[in-house]
């Protein structure tokens, strides 16, 4: 029941995805060969959300790995859990997208997309009751952003009523990999606004900060960053995979988090984050979890929730705890910081409790917030985009692949519209309700 098909694209997506499968396999007691070595029936009860049972009792991830060059996939294949994936589910080209969105979306990616869709169909058909798809990708490169959004729009056509959840790594303000990131990211957001249901927004800088500040790592690697992301990914779906007192699934999350269809970009956080050495000295309590969860330093994207207001939020707790205490703590947060929540959506924080904590912890919590402050991030990308686009810098790489300048202009204005929508709801108050009703119907 309620299966999720996982798709990872491009270098970033494949590296995050590989880490995620290590975490999920570990939670369900699956070793790198796909054999079950767990100690509790609960690990097997709903293992089929992410795994398919193959012959001989082997468990195979419902994962599709795609890239336009073989490099990253080879390293996934030779990594710790590389042998667990179905060999047919590695779909790759040879040319690479060279950080060019147009190559991923229109030329190279378009040639490979049909073979990816064949694998997607095969995975979807082996599901009993498909809940949706989760896509891991970055928005700054060529494959994850260009081909990733192409795949999302194709899946949207074929499975219009299934949930589409993305984990999107946005270019960070200070750490830049390539000069054309603002172009690739803006073109991708333009697609995600229309075709995705829920986007969890991550960025490397915020993840680095968490590693430096909270985890006290002096030289964080991408492995450390990806570990943080996989903790959130596992937290979001734990309700589907383990029994709980208050369940959440992808659709319930969407219903509770998205007040207006375009505003589906969320900030995520995970707690407890403690440095490796100090972990065993602290027993966590629900109030402590709650406090760290709402801490701005805990957010995995470089936007400060204190600069905006929460439209909605969702807290997914794991471990043995009293639901009453969870409810009290969440209410407490809302009452104390009421100025950070919009008052025209009452009770806008949803919580769920799943009984099984992650490996090595007594209890944990995953946070998903729909905050108007996320506009800071879109604004930042948009400013960089405009600075280059005004001079038509680097455009020939895109027009050379058959793109039109109009597409850039459209993407730019769509992103600016998104920013002003967030701003509009940030400023809205319950008193002026009448003024908005007319506008609502237009959106």
UniProtKB/Swiss-Prot annotation:
Pfam families: Tubulin (PF00091), Tubulin_C (PF03953)
Transmembrane segments: none
Entry's Gene Ontology cellular component terms: cytoplasm; microtubule
SMART domains in alphabetical order: Tubulin (SM00864), Tubulin_C (SM00865)
CDD domains in the cross-refs: beta_tubulin (cd02187)
Alphabetized UniProt keyword annotations: Cytoplasm, Cytoskeleton, GTP-binding, Magnesium, Metal-binding, Microtubule, Nucleotide-binding
Cofactor requirements of the protein: Mg(2+)
Acidic residues bias (residue ranges): 429-443
Positions of Mg(2+) binding: 69
Positions of the UniProt region annotated as Disordered: 423-443
GO molecular function terms noted in the UniProt entry: GTP binding; GTPase activity; metal ion binding; structural constituent of cytoskeleton
Main location: cytoplasm
Protein location: Cytoplasm, Cytoskeleton
GO biological process, one term: microtubule-based process
Residues annotated as binding GTP: 11, 69, 138, 142-144, 204, 226
InterPro entries assigned to the protein according to its UniProt record, in alphabetical order: Beta-tubulin_BS, Beta_tubulin, Tub_FtsZ_C, Tubulin, Tubulin/FtsZ-like_C, Tubulin/FtsZ_2-layer-sand-dom, Tubulin/FtsZ_GTPase_sf, Tubulin_C
Record note on quaternary structure: Dimer of alpha and beta chains. A typical microtubule is a hollow water-filled tube with an outer diameter of 25 nm and an inner diameter of 15 nM. Alpha-beta heterodimers associate head-to-tail to form protofilaments running lengthwise along the microtubule wall with the beta-tubulin subunit facing the microtubule plus end conferring a structural polarity. Microtubules usually have 13 protofilaments but different protofilament numbers can be found in some organisms and specialized cells.
Purpose of the protein: Tubulin is the major constituent of microtubules, a cylinder consisting of laterally associated linear protofilaments composed of alpha- and beta-tubulin heterodimers. Microtubules grow by the addition of GTP-tubulin dimers to the microtubule end, where a stabilizing cap forms. Below the cap, tubulin dimers are in GDP-bound state, owing to GTPase activity of alpha-tubulin.
Family under the similarity heading: Belongs to the tubulin family.
Protein name: Tubulin beta chain
Organism of origin: Volvox carteri
Gene coding for it: TUBB1
